[in-house]
């Protein structure tokens, strides 16, 4: 039962995350959209996206501080959402620009479009491979942190409490033995 109560405590703590989560979510969406926007349109309006990202991130951290949210929960939440959106952004980018590299070369006003498209494909394959390795490490860090927040432990009671005669009768009737330790899922 202690395992269920620990999971219950974590689920209750998610209730305190809702408001900071909205702003952190907006900050991460803004951060990833700013990268995509700068890739497509250039660096003209990057300051607007950057200010929006920093503002929403600061508001989310402020609400997390006001609600006395654990930093472990905050980093876990931030990393999980960031990894998800980064993977989505990378998937869209690799599909779009690897299958249609001429588009990026036209945006960059390249002189030799064919050599530019070949270099663009190579560049995006390297970037996506490196960022996938980064996401794997990031998600592994999230899982390690999640394991520290919720650790599943065996219950303290090691033997079932049965009457000796009852245990013998049931074991004789079913030709099986009782487990030595209680199981906590």
Swiss-Prot record:
Keywords of the record, alphabetical order, are: Meiosis
Q: Which organism is it from?
A: Schizosaccharomyces pombe (strain 972 / ATCC 24843) (Fission yeast)
Taken from the UniProt entry, a GO cellular component term is: cytoplasm
Q: What Gene Ontology biological process does one annotation of this record name?
A: meiotic cell cycle
Instruction: Report the superkingdom from the record.
Output: Eukaryota
Q: What is this protein called?
A: Meiotic expression up-regulated protein 31
């Amino acid at each position: 039962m202690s395992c269920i109560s620990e999971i219950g405590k974590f689920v209750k703590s998610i209730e305190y995350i809702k408001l900071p989560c909205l702003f952190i979510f907006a900050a991460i969406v803004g951060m990833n959209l700013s990268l995509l926007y700068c890739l497509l349109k250039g660096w003209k309006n990057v300051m607007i996206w950057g200010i929006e990202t920093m503002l929403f991130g600061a508001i989310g951290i402020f609400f997390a501080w006001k609600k006395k949210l654990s930093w472990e929960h905050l980093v876990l939440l931030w990393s999980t959402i960031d990894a998800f959106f980064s993977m989505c952004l990378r998937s869209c980018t690799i599909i779009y620009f690897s299958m249609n590299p001429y588009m990026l070369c036209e945006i960059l006003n390249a002189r030799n479009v064919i050599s530019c498209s070949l270099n663009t494909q190579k560049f995006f394959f390297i970037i996506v491979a490196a960022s996938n390795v980064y996401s794997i490490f990031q998600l592994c860090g999230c899982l390690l942190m999640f394991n520290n927040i919720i650790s599943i432990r065996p219950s303290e009671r090691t033997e079932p409490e049965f009457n000796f005669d009852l245990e013998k009768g049931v074991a004789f009737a079913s030709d099986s033995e009782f487990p030595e330790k209680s199981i906590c899922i």
